[in-house]
């Protein structure tokens, strides 16, 4: 009996020691399969995320809610919603995958809602939403896109189904962290999830996907700031009362804050230990809310996370959110939010806490969500990318890419609205921000050259002009009509991603376009590929109107390209058709689609 007790103690000590080392490069064994070569697993060392090859991680992406009933409902604003058709939804998702890859997304964040595919005991249920998760994991592996899973959220949920969390239990998130039955159900849910065999990938187990790199325990784990009534939360408050008795404490604010900190820390460590025991290579992460999180949620979750075993924390930034919530939803595009980022960086009650010693240098950090709230301006995404790097972030996912289809576009003033087709200027700013995020060193103190504009590195942005751009020797990205004095331009860019006109391209349409030089064995092959996106504008009522057929004039003014030496072809289903070129320079008419420009 004594020997068994000693052995049990040794096992606990080893698990604890291994868990503490997990943030220094631990990863489980992953049986290699075709397609794995697209990925580099990540680990944390010295509060920094690294790929297996030793390079620092810098991943830019979107929230991509393919497996959540809430997102499908959001995309169907009609009074009478059609019955969910999983095959039709997959076709929308597949097209949206192609769009976000065109926008340079490296990673997607997916909310998992037990209310969509698990019962009250945490057992997985075969639903369309679980099928969509299987499909999404498989598609990400096929396409080389990293996956960031938020394991628990309250959104979604079939009507009448009880679950650990569902759409009616937003304020019950804290109960899931303290009630014994919910804790056991959560353990069961996570164990079944990470060991699930994906039928789309020949039964591959979830935890063996090399592209699944982040396991965030819970999205926005809210707690009451004061002890709630037992009538409202009978099971949870009973746990609190038992804790008070065991610790000989009296009911009061100090006791509640102590209980809250202790239980959050216990919960974080519990899930982190469970993921370690299951040998899940994804890095565990704890969510620390939006800007002003300490004001709205108290410091307890921050204190608990700092003292916990997880090697990484996440945060979100929503310029304009508090302004919008003061009244009815409105278009905030005319307001300058650059000062907001400065305040967020400097004020501990906003997000200055990220600069505290207990986080900086102790925990890796990522951005779980960001957005320009009710705002279609194009200078803020790039400014936010610079801000995120100043805060040390290595992964950032915008909330949320809109999975839309023709006839279901969101209005201009919608709180969260990014889509390559229906918000082309904002999509261009997303691409500018991507380049800034990937090419800006971390922890450079955040500052701007002016209160309403900024110029740094290869980038420039302006609130008065509602313009941003990134230009290095190979790549040029811009969000509107660009003049040569706004930023130093390359002589001949090899890639152009733009909206509007620039010294290299004049275009009258209102959609994005992509121009890329084709190289063979390192040499320019006298061949350019051009992709033109649909024309999209907001009408007088602020509704997006997309035209997928309209033609516009495009003129190329790339140095060294004489009109007589080049020919333009439209490419459709692999077949080329010649397009007439007109003066001046290389001028031709384009409709949405693909083109090739080839030297004669």
Model-derived regions, located:
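Substrate-binding cleft of secreted/luminal carbohydrate-active enzymes
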Residues: 60, 373-450
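Charge-patterned, long linear interaction tracts outside catalytic cores
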Residues: 218, 222-229, 235-236, 457-505
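Bacterial Sec-dependent signal peptides at the C-terminal "C-region" and cleavage site
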Residues: 8, 12-32
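A conserved mid-domain beta-alpha-beta active-site/ligand-binding segment of alpha/beta enzyme cores
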Residues: 194, 427-476
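C-terminal beta-sandwich/jelly-roll accessory domains of carbohydrate-active enzymes
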Residues: 476-600
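Active-site mouth of glycoside hydrolases
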Residues: 30-310
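Positively charged n-region of N-terminal signal peptides that target proteins for export
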Residues: 1-5
């Amino acid at each position: 009996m004594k020997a068994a007790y000693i052995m049990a103690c040794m096992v606990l000590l080893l698990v604890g020691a291994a868990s503490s080392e997990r943030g220094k490069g631990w990863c489980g064994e992953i049986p290699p399969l075709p397609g794995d070569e697209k990925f580099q697993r990540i680990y944390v060392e010295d509060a920094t995320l690294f790929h297996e090859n030793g390079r620092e991680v810098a991943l830019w992406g979107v929230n991509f809610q393919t497996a959540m009933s809430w997102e499908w409902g959001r995309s169907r604003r009609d009074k009478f919603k059609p019955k969910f058709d999983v095959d039709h939804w997959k076709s929308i998702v597949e097209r949206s995958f192609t769009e976000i890859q065109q926008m340079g997304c490296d990673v997607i964040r997916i909310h998992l809602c037990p209310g969509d595919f698990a019962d009250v005991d945490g057992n997985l249920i075969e639903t369309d939403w679980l099928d969509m998760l299987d499909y999404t994991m498989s598609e990400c592996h096929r396409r080389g896109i990293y996956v960031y899973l938020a394991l628990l959220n309250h959104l979604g949920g079939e009507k009448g189904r009880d679950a650990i969390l569902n759409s009616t239990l937003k304020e019950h998130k804290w109960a899931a962290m303290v009630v014994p039955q919910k804790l056991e159900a959560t353990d069961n849910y996570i164990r079944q999830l990470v060991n699930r065999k994906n039928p789309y990938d020949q039964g591959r187990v979830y935890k063996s996907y090399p592209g699944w790199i982040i396991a965030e325990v819970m999205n926005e784990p809210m707690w009451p700031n004061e002890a709630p009534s037992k009538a409202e939360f009978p099971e949870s408050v009973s746990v609190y009362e038992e804790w008070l008795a065991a610790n000989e404490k009296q009911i009061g604010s100090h006791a509640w804050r102590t209980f809250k900190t202790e239980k959050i820390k216990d919960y974080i460590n519990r899930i982190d230990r469970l993921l370690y025991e299951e040998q899940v290579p994804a890095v565990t992460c704890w969510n620390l809310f939006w800007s002003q999180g300490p004001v709205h949620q108290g410091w307890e979750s921050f204190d608990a996370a700092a003292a916990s075993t997880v090697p990484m924390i996440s945060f979100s930034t929503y310029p304009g959110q508090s302004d919008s919530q003061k009244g009815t939803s409105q278009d905030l595009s005319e307001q300058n939010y650059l000062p907001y980022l400065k305040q967020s960086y400097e004020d501990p009650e906003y997000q200055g806490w990220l600069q505290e010693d207990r986080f900086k240098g102790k925990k890796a950090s990522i951005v779980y969500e960001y957005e320009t709230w009710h705002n279609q301006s194009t200078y803020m995404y790039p400014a936010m990318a610079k801000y995120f790097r100043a805060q040390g972030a290595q992964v950032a996912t915008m909330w949320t890419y809109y999975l839309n289809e023709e006839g279901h576009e969101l209005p201009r003033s919608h709180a969260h609205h990014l889509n390559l087709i229906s918000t082309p200027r904002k999509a261009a700013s997303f691409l500018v921000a991507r380049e800034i995020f990937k090419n800006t060193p971390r922890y450079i103190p955040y500052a701007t050259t002016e209160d309403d504009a900024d110029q740094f590195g290869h980038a420039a942005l302006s609130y008065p002009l509602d313009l941003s751009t990134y230009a290095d020797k190979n790549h040029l990205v811009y969000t509107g009509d660009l003049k040569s004095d706004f930023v130093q331009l390359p002589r001949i860019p090899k890639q152009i991603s733009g909206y509007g006109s620039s010294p290299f391209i004049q275009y009258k349409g209102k959609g994005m376009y992509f121009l890329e030089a084709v190289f063979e064995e390192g040499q320019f092959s006298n061949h350019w590929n051009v992709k033109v996106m649909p024309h999209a504008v907001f009408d007088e009522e602020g509704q997006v109107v997309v035209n997928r057929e309209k033609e516009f004039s495009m003129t190329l003014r790339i140095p060294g390209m004489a009109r007589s030496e080049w020919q333009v072809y439209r490419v459709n289903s692999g077949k080329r058709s010649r397009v007439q070129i007109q003066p001046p320079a290389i001028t031709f008419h384009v409709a949405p689609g693909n083109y090739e420009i080839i030297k004669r």
